[in-house]
Amino acid sequence: MPALFSPIRFGTLELANRIVIPPMCMYSAEDGCATDWHLMHYGNLAQSGAGLLVLEATAVEARGRISRYDLGLWNDAQVQALRPVLAHIRRHSPDRE
């Protein structure tokens, strides 16, 4: 089996394979909140079978954004909007952690 499809361990984290989906700025958030678009986009990527999926740029304060359409985590509404997206990713990812 090629190494690309072999599990790999980083400390206590074990990935099902060595395929990584890097972060891509999608500029689709509304007021820093994830939307149904994020649920569909990341849900599809999670189902790809990649061992690691890295989310896009996510600002921890409004003035740290690179665009007004970035995801944010500086208020409770943004955290709540991202929860279903992360749950969907976990449900459909190969490692489900």
Region locations from a protein language model:
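Flavin-dependent oxidoreductase catalytic cores
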Residues: 1-97
